[in-house]
Amino acid sequence: GKGASAAAAHLRYLQRDGTTREGERATLYGRIADAVDGKGFGERGAGDRHQFRFIVSPEDGDQYEDLKPLARRLMGRLEEDLGTKLDWVAVDHFNTGHPHTHIVVRGKDDRGADLIIARDYMTTGIRERAAELVDLDLGPRTHREIAQTLRAEVEQERLTSIDRALLKGADAERVVATNGRDAFDQTLRAGRLAK
């Protein structure tokens, strides 16, 4: 159906030319194999009600020689959290300033039932799990590094952690206040709202 063809098109897009460090065509990988068949994955998921897609983009991703071990460990954590083995494929992209991994998960659990992932786990839980693993690999970031990253977020043309904090603090009418925990936080919020 339409969903299966869209999923196949997405996998082809992820494997396009020019996305590896060497500018080559990217290769899908999985739990164990460094090269997996996207067509086989698509066929297994053809009848799934949905598919989960997310991007893991560690802030210090450029410090990883290879993102595969991080992605595999992250997926292991997700399986522990969700209480099921997952059928997934991933691909690493190095064609932007921020190396990142696209992960696609079938919409079935290991018992063949529809896989359910809570919205807040998709929006924050996966990010928190990835950050924990990066801290284990590279060590925790200093306060200065975190502040530097937040200052840069003020000018970003994408949803940032500042935006998420503003949305979380919005009232029922979706009105946000610039007052923050401290002067630095207030400056970040005001700068982002002015953008």
Task: Say what each PLM segment does.
Residues 1-99, 103-195:
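N-terminal nicking endonuclease/strand-transfer module with a His-rich metal-binding environment
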